[in-house]
Amino acid sequence: MYIQMTDGVPPPPEQSSLDHRIDELERQKEIDDWLPITSSRNAKWWYSTFHNVTAMVGAGVLGLPFFMAQLGWGPGIAVLILSWIITLYTLWQMVEMHEMVPGKRFDRYHELGQFAFGERLGLYIIVPQQIIVEVGVCIVYMVTGGQSLKKFHEIACQDCSPIRLSFFIMIFASSHFVLSHLPNFNSISGVSLVAAVMSLSYSTIAWTATAAKGVQEDVQYGYKSGTTASTVLSFFTGLGGIAFAYAGHNVVLEIQATIPSTPSNPSKGPMWRGVVVAYVVVALCYFPVALVGYGVFGNAVLDNVLMSLETPVWAIATANLFVVMHVIGSYQIFAMPVFDMVETFLVKKLNFKPSTVLRFIVRNVYVALTMFIGIMIPFFGGLLAFFGGFAFAPTSYFLPCIMWLLIYKPKRFSLSWWTNWVCIVLGVVLMILSSIGGLRQIIIQSKDYSFFS
């Protein structure tokens, strides 16, 4: 903006400062209109439903019977229900805190963290954990997509020569070299809808096909491990496996940012409606698969319940194909906040001009990087079970409670105060125990790990 001068006399400093401020606001608006999280705010409430379902229901749902076997009936059902309740509560907290400051929206998890913990500390606490979860999940989904494609190929073409997993990961990644150029959350709503439907579909196939098989002869529900130490460590692994199945909080504020908001109709109303429906869908996916799978196969169930089913072949093949379609959408949901972080850093800190070329380079590099790591370390999911424990538990179970206590300061020993502290303690215990179990799994499985398999 040019500063006008009258009779050779510059405007007063106050006017120059105002003009500079207006320029900054205009530039900020231009950037916000380009960034993926804030560029579109016209989402409907049901968008949040399938975004949350896609983010939360991963292919790990097929491993729930295996984790139930490590916990047993009583503890398994308790963890399944308690995790559902706690994460629904912490998700409600985040939805409420999105617009707690009148006239301001915390569109990103780290923005809420900065408000609660301070500008610098909030970044240091939130961003590393978000990156671990979001980038880690994207890598795992690269491998999962490739593995499911490989399994589908093996079933559909049993006489074909075996093909390395690496090539199936490349095939899976090719879809993301295209889809990753969709600019924002609203533009991937169709992909997310398909993914949400697929998650419900393959979960339904898994538990109905298992139920049709009937309870196996000589089924046993006791702990499978031989020693007490092994049983306890397996218990820790199962605890983390079930609890982290609900860890979708890393993208909830970014999803809510796409919903329009006015003082009379804030975004928390439609967002919460979508979250409740999403959690009903999640329960319809998780509970039948976990309970029916464990009930039919007992402690002999494999870590993917589909692998415990030998027939019908068509159902197993179809379910694997549905898994591929689901993790395509899930990858995009978790990649979008990463795109936003990187693109924000480039245009705000390094002063790159917002452009299609910049976006093209950033997103292709990210997809290529996650693909390469997935090919190089196809056992990355096992590593994430350990390292992810330090990020999944905080971001989903107790960081929202800590921020709630810091911001709202509920009266000591009130119901809100007690509820949040109970969630914090349980979350910290979960983080420690599940990480111990994850480390044990790495040690056990390390002999089977191979790079570039």
From Swiss-Prot:
Which residue spans belong to the Cytoplasmic compartment?
Answer: 1-44, 87-122, 186-187, 253-276, 340-359, 409-412
Instruction: State the membrane topology.
Output: Multi-pass membrane protein
- Which residues point to the Extracellular side? 144-164, 209-231, 298-318, 383-385, 434-453
Database matches in InterPro entries: AA_transpt_TM
Q: Name one GO biological process term.
A: amino acid transport
Would the keyword Plastid turn up in this protein's UniProt record? Answer: no
Family per record: Belongs to the amino acid/polyamine transporter 2 family. Amino acid/auxin permease (AAAP) (TC 2.A.18.2) subfamily.
Please describe what this protein does. Amino acid transporter.
Q: What is this protein called?
A: Lysine histidine transporter-like 1
Q: Whose protein is this, by species?
A: Arabidopsis thaliana (Mouse-ear cress)
